[in-house]
Amino acid sequence: LECYQMSKVVTCKPEETFCYSDVFMPFRNHIVYTSGCSSYCRDGTGEKCCTTDRCNGARGG
């Protein structure tokens, strides 16, 4: 699983999925962009999962 994310290619293990999410940090008053490979991932608020090769999780801005 290859995911182009933040100008770099992230390779995950075959049994893993690539997850990226937007986490709001109240004490810093801005959104932190987190991403990584995980064997478990949920599609929830601000969180997406990359399940196909070479999918782009990076959003503009």
UniProtKB/Swiss-Prot annotation:
Q: In which tissues is it expressed?
A: Expressed by the venom gland.
This protein is called what?
A: Weak toxin CM-2a
Q: Does Disulfide bond appear among the keywords? A: yes
Q: What is the lineage of its organism?
A: Eukaryota, Metazoa, Chordata, Craniata, Vertebrata
Where in or outside the cell? Secreted
**UniProt cross-references to SUPFAM superfamilies, sorted A to Z:** Snake toxin-like
Q: Which GO terms describe its molecular function?
A: toxin activity
| Pfam (any one) | Toxin_cobra-type
Which Cys pairs does UniProt list as disulfide-bonded?
C3-C19, C12-C37, C41-C49, C50-C55
